Regions:
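Hinge/lid segment of periplasmic solute-binding proteins
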Residues: 39-47, 114-169, 225-228, 232-237, ...
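Short, solvent-exposed loop/beta-turn-alpha elements that line the ligand-binding surface or hinge
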Residues: 44-47, 130-144, 187, 206, ...
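Conserved C-terminal helix/tail region of periplasmic/extracytoplasmic solute-binding proteins
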Residues: 52, 83, 178, 184, ...
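Extracytoplasmic/periplasmic substrate-binding proteins
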Residues: 58, 228-231, 236, 253, ...
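Extracytoplasmic "Venus flytrap"/periplasmic binding protein-like
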Residues: 71-145, 178-181, 186-189, 285-294, ...
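A structural signal for short loop-to-beta-strand junctions that line the ligand-binding cleft
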Residues: 100, 107-108, 136-177, 327, ...
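Long, aromatic- and glycine/proline-rich binding clefts that accommodate carbohydrate-like moieties
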Residues: 151, 318-325, 372-424, 428
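Helix-loop-helix "hinge/cap" segment bordering the ligand-binding cleft or interdomain interface
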Residues: 153-227, 236-280, 347-353, 434, ...
Length: 463
């Protein structure tokens, strides 16, 4: 990308920061280990011993700091580099990372959501790692959709190395489906089948003597609300942006149809309205506690069921949890949002060699597998994805979703702001559905507002 273009993107990113809410250097070619061969890493030619790398992470699993420290311990022992792992909540991380990039008062490495990488890159405060990624296998070591998250449209560069990935699938209670007389093999094969399943679950009312709702999902309080609703839009033939990424298409007839599928679940009493006042973690806990028969979640939920220290599970829910692929529409295969997190190095880092050595280590196939098994995500790299996906049938469902059903968003600097515009209107639409006063015309009007705001943001970049 030409320098003037990069400057314009930096200006846009700074100018529109007030609209945001929290979502989701020099090198040493010999530092760290060969990312495809060893776990602890080869001895670096240039000693990094005695350096300290600060690493910001988000809430990855139930014990994010302890799990990450466990994973980096062999790296510390082999290289002599100390890794300080610091937790930054998803609700504040966007502002924290932005402020650190602009001020220069930053850690060395930060985790960033895949959809946030273009925005952060446009700030100009992060290293371009393009000349180093051959050391970790380059693009061929990753699925195309995952590698795409490392880049910014229109630029030559790699700004965030993929760390882990995730997709969303249907979670359900086997005992609840049995009580409703529904065969799990056909319960979620299409959107029509999903709705029929929820109608039968609604009639059950109780499982094991305890009340249960057929389905639940979060509303406006969920930072990832757009990730939850866009699959319905995609399944209806809609899209978030035009093919050239210059105009919003969230108000297209197909997008309206997709959003309407979700709001109909609310209006027909199949989606527990009380869940709309909760955030994603709270809804997840409702499922784990036995109060929902079906919900949509990521692979970390499955992993948490295997952890004895996660006491949010009821015995019945833990014993009966199962997963199924997202159901498709009339002419679609059942899309799901595919996301995750990447690792970015701040330009202000005084330990860029050590920072890259850490990223290289965390890109090792076995290290990625070990970390995925700890926190319940999927590795970003192809080979360990296959390894984790083959561990049991439930993991196979997530692996299939990542390979065959996953979609994400355009890698443009404005996406974080556009997503926020969509989130605000999606939340309002769901609130109106819960209140019983939502018409098709109102859905269209609200999505028109979202599209208008998004077009304004996209136009600023074009200027």
């Amino acid at each position: 990308m030409r320098k003037s273009r990069m400057t314009a993107l930096m200006a846009v990113a700074l100018a529109v920061l007030s609209f945001l809410v929290a979502a989701c250097g020099s090198s040493s070619d010999d530092a760290g280990d060969n990312a495809t061969k060893t776990n602890a890493g080869a001895t670096p030619a240039k000693s990094l011993k005695g350096q300290t790398v600060r690493l910001w992470i988000m809430n990855n699993g139930p014990n994010p700091v302890a799990d990450t420290r466990k994973i980096v311990a062999p790296f510390e022992q082999k290289t002599g580099v100390k890794v300080n792992v610091e937790l930054v909540g998803w609700d504040v991380q966007l502002d924290r990372i932005r402020n650190a990039a602009v001020s220069g008062e930053a850690p060395d490495v930060t985790q960033a959501g895949t959809t946030q990488v273009p925005f952060f890159a446009a700030l100009g405060g992060f290293e371009n790692e393009q000349d180093k990624v051959s050391q970790i296998g380059g693009a061929s070591a990753y699925a195309p959709g995952i590698w795409k998250t490392s880049q910014v449209e229109g630029q030559d560069g790699v700004w965030g190395v993929p760390w882990f990935t995730e997709a969303r699938t249907i979670y359900y209670r086997k005992d609840a489906l049995k009580a409703a007389g529904v065969d799990p093999k056909t319960a979620f094969t299409s959107q029509e089948a999903l709705k029929a399943t929820l109608e039968k679950l609604k009639a059950v009312k109780e499982v094991g003597g305890k009340p249960i709702s057929p389905f639940g999902g979060p509303g406006k309080k969920a930072y990832d609300l757009v990730h939850n609703l866009m699959p319905w839009v995609w399944d209806a033939g809609g899209a978030e942006l035009s093919s050239d990424n210059k105009q919003s298409t969230i108000n297209s007839p197909q997008a309206v149809q997709g959003v309407k599928f979700a709001t109909d679940l609310v209006g027909e009493g199949l989606w527990d309205k009380s869940m709309l006042e909760r955030d994603g973690q709270q809804v997840e806990d409702q499922f784990k506690g036995g109060r929902l028969a079906v919900f949509i979640g990521g692979p970390w939920v499955l992993q948490s069921a295997k952890r004895a220290d996660d006491d949010t599970w009821s015995d019945a829910a833990r014993k009966n949890v199962a997963v199924a692929p997202m159901p498709g529409g009339a002419n679609s295969k059942g899309y799901t949002f595919i996301g995750g997190s990447n690792l970015m190095v701040f330009k202000s880092s005084q330990h860029k060699d050590a920072a890259w050595a850490l990223i290289k280590y965390l890109s090792d196939d076995q290290v990625q597998t070990d970390y995925a098994n700890l926190m319940g995500m999927f590795p970003a790299r192809l080979k360990p994805q296959e390894q984790v996906g083959a561990t049991d049938p439930d993991h196979e469902a997530f692996y299939a979703a990542i390979k065959d059903q996953g979609r994400s968003y355009a890698p443009i600097a404005q996406w974080a702001q556009v997503e926020n515009a969509y989130k605000n209107q999606f939340g309002q639409i769901l609130d109106q559905a819960a209140g019983g006063d939502l018409s098709d015309q109102q859905i269209q009007s609200d999505l028109d507002k979202a599209a208008k705001e998004a077009d304004g943001l996209l136009a600023q970049s074009a200027g």
